[in-house]
Amino acid sequence: MVDVSETTERCVVHKRQGQDGGDAAWRGVQKKLRDFYGSAIYDSWLSALVYSGNENGRVVLLVPTRFIKEWILVHYLERILKYWQDESDAVYSVDICVSDGVGVQPQMAEHPDGAVDGPPVVMVGGTYDHLSSPLDPRFTFDNFVVGKPNELAFAAARRVAESSAPIPGSNPLFLYGGVGLGKTHLMHAIAWYILNSSVKRKIAYLSAEKFMYQYVTALRSKDIMLFKEQFRSVDILMVDDVQFISGKDSTQEEFFHTFNALIDQNKQLVISADRSPSDLDGVEDRIKSRLGWGLVADINETTFELRLGILQLKIEKMGVHVPNEVLEFLAKNIKSNIRELEGALNKVVAHSSLVGRSVTIESASGILSDLLRANHRMVTVGMIQKKVAEFFGIKLEDMYSARRLRALARPRQVAMYLAKRLTQKSLPDIGKSFGGRDHATVIHAVKQIEKFMEDDAKLADDINLLIRMLR
């Protein structure tokens, strides 16, 4: 593990005295970095590095801004050090230092060969312009594990990436699902695929919050026309977590007009959120309607098999050995989201490396005790009744009443279905919690909801959202 912390003193840049023999080694490191990461990532981030010198085994590399430095420290420093040590046994550390005099900016990465028609306003893979957010090099299609919960979203994202123009019925592509299930991964994967393809397209990828920030900044600086021109000149606009424009009236107005302008120009939009378009509370109906124009693909909760596959791919990429029974233990017990699952694996592997002992189920249980408790939070029938009543806008006492109005009966059946699915209560006990109903009523409710979910996508979305909220 590389220590990315550094003192001010360590980052003082000393003027090179003559040749230290490091130039040839640095060229070797640069070649290995380009070969490993590819031209797109290298040109976006690593081409900014300038070799300063080797001071008794401490290599100093310069970058023009602190942002570039911090990004390289987090994402690339370990491999840079490894390649330096491959080139020279005497190197023990690499420091990244900011120097205003470097004067090196990475290439605009609209296309791997740098050939761009007209002035580039959007860059994929970096934030040296003021539109796009950085892309994570780990988030590619090759690193995405496909299973039943995400196969539609994956296929749709891949199809958009491979097509040179918007596909009828898939514009916009709207991806939705809970936190940490892979929406952002797929959006980054689309961008990386296009970036490395032979088709020249300008892409803007950013969060809804950053879109709002850019819009407000443009208003304050009276650059609103430039803002409009830049966002409406892209070939693909990707906006992550669009639910965050909820309640922001002026931002929604601008997003609406940007959306329309791009659709009118036959440009592709990819949008993500934590819920379906119709469930985006606080978002204008006209926007929700447009978000549902194209293909709406949900990413459901992961299955055991999918979680296990993700862990197996992860350890393969890490180059470490973890017994399969430990992977199965993690896949069985950490169900919240992929982010937590991968974080748990990282924690277990790091602990094993530090203490020098193999990973076992017992050691993993101890290391992850807090996380395991959180993932086994007890869901009660009372919690379900309260949440369902709030969700459907009925009174809590309607859960127990004998009234059979459809507006009350359907939420009550949903609550029974969730109680059967999320608790360990017996059917008779569940029935008693709903005003003394018998187990046959609960069975009927469960079967009804299962049948309705097959035919009613909106109800299925609502129930999946309730499950995420309860867990």
UniProtKB/Swiss-Prot annotation:
Recorded superkingdom: Bacteria
GO biological process, one term: regulation of DNA replication
Residue numbers spanned by region Domain II: 91-133
Disulfide linkage: none
Places the protein is found: Cytoplasm
Ranges where the record places region Domain III, AAA+ region: 134-352
Keyword DNA-binding: yes
Residue positions binding ATP: G180, G182, K183, T184
Region (Domain IV, binds dsDNA): 353-471
Cellular compartments per GO CC: cytoplasm; plasma membrane
Database matches in Pfam families: Bac_DnaA, Bac_DnaA_C, DnaA_N
Keyword entries, A-Z: ATP-binding, Cytoplasm, DNA replication, DNA-binding, Lipid-binding, Nucleotide-binding
Nucleotide-binding found in the keyword field: yes
Gene3D superfamilies, A to Z: 1.10.1750.10, 1.10.8.60, 3.30.300.180, P-loop containing nucleotide triphosphate hydrolases (3.40.50.300)
Region (Domain I, interacts with DnaA modulators): 1-91
An MF annotation (GO) of this entry: lipid binding
Family annotation (SMART domains): AAA, Bac_DnaA_C
The record's note on its domains: Domain I is involved in oligomerization and binding regulators, domain II is flexibile and of varying length in different bacteria, domain III forms the AAA+ region, while domain IV binds dsDNA.
NCBIfam families hit by this protein: DnaA (TIGR00362)
Family, per entry: Belongs to the DnaA family.
Role description: Plays an essential role in the initiation and regulation of chromosomal replication. ATP-DnaA binds to the origin of replication (oriC) to initiate formation of the DNA replication initiation complex once per cell cycle. Binds the DnaA box (a 9 base pair repeat at the origin) and separates the double-stranded (ds)DNA. Forms a right-handed helical filament on oriC DNA; dsDNA binds to the exterior of the filament while single-stranded (ss)DNA is stabiized in the filament's interior.
Subunit relationships: Oligomerizes as a right-handed, spiral filament on DNA at oriC.
The protein, known as: Chromosomal replication initiator protein DnaA
Species in which this protein is naturally found: Anaplasma marginale (strain St. Maries)
Protein's gene: dnaA
